[in-house]
């Protein structure tokens, strides 16, 4: 092969060699923060309803034992998820107490994202209860499946005014599995920092949907 032929072959092969070179290593995909994963897990239940019941055994909650309960993702948007909590009650209209709605909102971005849980309590006519819209805001990243909500100052003032001193150290927890998970659960829990014996916990089977109930009172 002449020098001219060799040079021509090298020039022709150059583009192919360039294509064959390994691509530069790309940065590994950034994983979702715990907050992003939690919000996604909570949000992907929107519109669904699940059956559940009392899972704790605190004697103070004896009147809740054995009652049918339903959690219904009644309203959702990019910054808010409202979950109606229905409790079977033979003394309530149509046999159900529909007075409670848990409202979780998000604020901030990325690792600075925080969540706030508020309790919307209504009477059967839709009017707000004297003790309503209490709750707290998460103080750390939490986990992809659970967030804790220590009682906030606004709620402390409300509880103090209403003589609910036992609630001044409330810590609520919301735990949720993604809707696609085979054994998915949804949990609402209450504990108190000054009372290690206090535990109120309701659990729902979030792997099996049920027919959505009527709207919560006032919604």
Residue ranges and their predicted role:
Residues 66-69, 95-101, 129, 169, ...:
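Short, surface-exposed coil-to-beta transition loops
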Residues 108-163:
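An exposed acidic His-Trp-rich patch
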Residues 16-18:
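C-terminal motif of bacterial Sec signal peptides marking the signal peptidase cleavage site
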Residues 20-22:
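Bacterial signal peptide processing site
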Residues 130-135, 185-219:
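Edge beta-strand at a domain terminus
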Residues 1-8:
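Bacterial N-terminal signal peptides that target proteins for export
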Residues 29-62:
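Tryptophan-anchored aromatic micro-motifs
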Residues 74-117:
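Mid-chain, structured segments of secreted extracytoplasmic proteins
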């Amino acid at each position: 092969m002449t020098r001219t032929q060799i040079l021509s072959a090298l020039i022709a092969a150059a583009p192919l060699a360039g294509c064959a070179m390994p691509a530069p290593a790309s940065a590994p995909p950034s994983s979702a923060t715990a907050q992003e994963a939690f919000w996604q897990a909570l949000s992907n239940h929107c519109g669904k309803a699940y059956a559940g019941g009392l899972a704790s055994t605190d004697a103070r909650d004896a009147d809740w034992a054995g009652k049918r309960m339903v959690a219904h993702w009644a309203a959702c948007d990019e910054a808010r998820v409202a979950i109606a909590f229905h409790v079977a009650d033979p003394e309530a209209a149509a046999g159900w107490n529909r007075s409670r709605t848990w409202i979780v909102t998000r604020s901030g971005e990325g690792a600075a994202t925080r969540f706030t849980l508020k309790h919307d309590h209504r009477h059967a006519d839709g009017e707000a209860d004297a003790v309503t819209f209490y709750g707290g805001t998460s103080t750390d990243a939490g986990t992809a499946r659970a967030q804790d909500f220590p009682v906030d100052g606004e709620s402390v003032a409300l509880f103090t005014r209403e003589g609910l001193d036992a609630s001044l150290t409330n810590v609520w927890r919301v735990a949720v599995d993604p809707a696609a998970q085979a054994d998915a659960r949804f949990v609402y829990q209450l504990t108190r920092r000054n009372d290690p014996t206090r535990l109120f916990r309701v659990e729902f089977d979030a792997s099996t949907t049920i027919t959505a109930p009527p709207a919560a009172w006032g919604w």
